[in-house]
């Protein structure tokens, strides 16, 4: 099946400009330092803000088969788990984090 490369690039640019870049800018705007660099992270609440921001972004993507859950343990930073039903055999695990470290 041949793809129209110009249309694919156009769609990619639209998604980047319309969804990814604004969301990334909003994410970067939240300080959300790692607990190692912000001992009062629970009181500051920025890690919770980032989790909520990311959950809203995930909700807006409309990805079929996607589910997520936020796990909290007292005294530990929250964990966001995202699952997407696959279309083939096997599993993939991707790890990332939403906190930041100062430069």
Question: What is each residue range found by the language model?
Answer:
Residues 2-103:
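Acidic/His- and Gly-rich active-site-bordering loop/insert found
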């Amino acid at each position: 099946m041949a793809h129209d490369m110009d249309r694919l690039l156009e769609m990619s640019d639209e998604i980047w400009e319309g969804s990814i870049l604004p969301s990334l800018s909003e994410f970067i705007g939240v300080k959300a330092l790692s607990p190692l660099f912000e001992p009062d992270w629970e009181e500051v609440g920025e890690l919770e803000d980032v989790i909520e921001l990311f959950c809203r972004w995930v909700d807006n993507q409309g990805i079929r088969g996607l589910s997520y859950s936020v796990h909290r343990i007292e005294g530990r930073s929250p964990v966001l788990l995202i699952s997407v039903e696959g279309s083939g055999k096997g599993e993939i695990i991707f790890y990332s984090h939403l906190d930041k470290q100062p430069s």
